[in-house]
């Protein structure tokens, strides 16, 4: 049997590889503390689960759902955006529920790119932006994110011959993996740049509700003209501890939303209706869970930053997101340092190069680790310092 070239050329997904390494270590009876994957360990709030249980017993929710989501869910999503960001959305034309935002991100390339087009993709970045673009037959032009520019892309440095073929610009703030944030002035620059060069902007914003020290991230759609040029992907996964329930949204430009809707309707059957109803409970109910989450993650951030500094690493505490982006010691590469930590301490981190070539020299640590495990990891890191 011969597989398609697109599959033959598809690299293994980064986090699948990491999970395999962890499983191998644990199968040998070794203790492993993993800071590798950003999957909240905190439970879904009880009032949200109660709505799911209630909805699951209703036979009307046992049938095929509507691909574009329940009207009442789209309305709840639009109202949440209005309350949170002051952004007004038409729930019928500018809101599309997704089976997790990753699904929409993966589909976007097929909606907005043809073979030979160019996608402008930050580097380092969540791997799906580049992989989905390549699967759709497009070329990827990397936009380096570096500390000197606060991990923001330099749009003016993009060559004209690239811009003439570029169709999509990906951005992501608060950022994964760097933890960087972007203000409204940057989003305004992006909206103006996209309008000038006829680009479709795809902003991935699932970490807007994970922020520290009183910081409040803004939405790309708050920029003037943003809805004319782009959409924003959001997720309930990180905000309400719902990664396992797979529900997110795309909002913004009506033409782009309609393209995603048409694509989805031909490939999937939508989000299970009971999960849509639990999402409504999350969006319409108390938002105190967000404050509670942020307090927990901030405490973890502070402990991890302190421990990394104690072993000689120059770490900046992130203002938002679930990640610490830490430069590795001199004489190490991202991969060699991550490997040494795993071999000598049993602590798993993600090498920065897993997110692109510009991630060289860094590792990423996630805050989605129970406090007890964090303390064990910190003890292991302290032991590493003594032995090195």
UniProtKB/Swiss-Prot annotation:
Query: Which amino acid positions bind pyridoxal 5'-phosphate, per UniProt?
Result: 101-102, 126, 176, 207, 235-237, 246
| The protein's required cofactors | pyridoxal 5'-phosphate
Q: In which pathway does it act?
A: Amino-acid biosynthesis; L-lysine biosynthesis via DAP pathway; LL-2,6-diaminopimelate from (S)-tetrahydrodipicolinate (aminotransferase route): step 1/1
Catalysed reaction, written as an equation: (2S,6S)-2,6-diaminopimelate + 2-oxoglutarate = (S)-2,3,4,5-tetrahydrodipicolinate + L-glutamate + H2O + H(+)
**Which residue positions does N6-(pyridoxal phosphate)lysine occur at?**
238
CDD domains xref list: AAT_like (cd00609)
EC numbers for this chain: 2.6.1.83
Q: Name the family.
A: Belongs to the class-I pyridoxal-phosphate-dependent aminotransferase family. LL-diaminopimelate aminotransferase subfamily.
* Name by which UniProt lists this protein: LL-diaminopimelate aminotransferase
Q: Which organism is it from?
A: Dehalococcoides mccartyi (strain CBDB1)
Give the taxonomic lineage as stored in the record.
Answer: Bacteria, Bacillati, Chloroflexota, Dehalococcoidia, Dehalococcoidales
């Amino acid at each position: 049997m011969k597989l398609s070239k697109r599959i033959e050329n598809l690299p293994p997904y980064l986090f699948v590889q990491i999970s395999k390494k962890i499983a191998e270590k644990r199968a040998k009876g070794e203790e492993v503390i993993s800071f590798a994957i950003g999957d909240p360990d905190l439970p879904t709030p009880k009032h949200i689960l109660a709505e799911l249980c209630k909805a699951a017993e209703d036979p009307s929710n046992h049938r095929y759902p509507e691909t574009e989501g329940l009207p009442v869910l789209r309305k709840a999503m639009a109202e949440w955006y209005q309350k949170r960001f002051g952004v007004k959305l038409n729930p019928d034309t500018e809101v599309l529920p997704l089976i997790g935002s990753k699904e929409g991100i993966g589909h976007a390339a097929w909606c907005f790119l043809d073979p030979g087009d160019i996608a402008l993709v930050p580097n380092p970045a969540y791997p799906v932006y580049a992989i989905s673009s390549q699967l759709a037959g497009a070329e990827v032009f990397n936009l380096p994110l570096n500390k000197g520019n606060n991990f923001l892309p330099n749009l003016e440095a993009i060559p004209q011959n690239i811009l003439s073929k570029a169709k999509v610009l990906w951005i992501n703030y608060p950022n994964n993996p760097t933890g960087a944030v972007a203000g409204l002035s940057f989003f305004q620059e992006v909206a103006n740049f996209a309008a000038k060069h006829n680009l479709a902007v795809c902003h991935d914003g699932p970490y807007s509700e994970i922020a520290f020290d009183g910081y409040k991230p803004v939405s790309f759609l708050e920029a003037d003209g943003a809805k004319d040029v782009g959409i924003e992907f959001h997720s309930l996964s990180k905000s309400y501890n719902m990664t396992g329930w797979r529900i997110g949204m795309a909002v913004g430009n009506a033409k782009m939303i309609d393209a995603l809707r048409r694509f989805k309707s031909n490939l999937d059957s939508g989000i299970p209706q009971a999960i849509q109803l639990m999402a409504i409970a999350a969006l319409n109910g108390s938002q105190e869970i967000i404050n509670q989450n942020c307090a927990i993650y901030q405490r973890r951030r502070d402990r991890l930053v302190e421990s990394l500094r104690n072993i000689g690493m120059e770490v900046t505490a992130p203002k938002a997101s679930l990640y610490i982006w830490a430069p590795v010691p001199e004489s190490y590469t991202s991969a060699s340092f991550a490997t040494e930590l795993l071999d000598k301490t049993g602590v798993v981190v993600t090498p920065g190069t897993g997110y692109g070539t510009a991630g060289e020299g860094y590792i990423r640590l996630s805050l989605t680790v129970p406090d007890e495990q964090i303390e064990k990891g910190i003890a292991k890191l302290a032991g590493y310092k003594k032995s090195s």
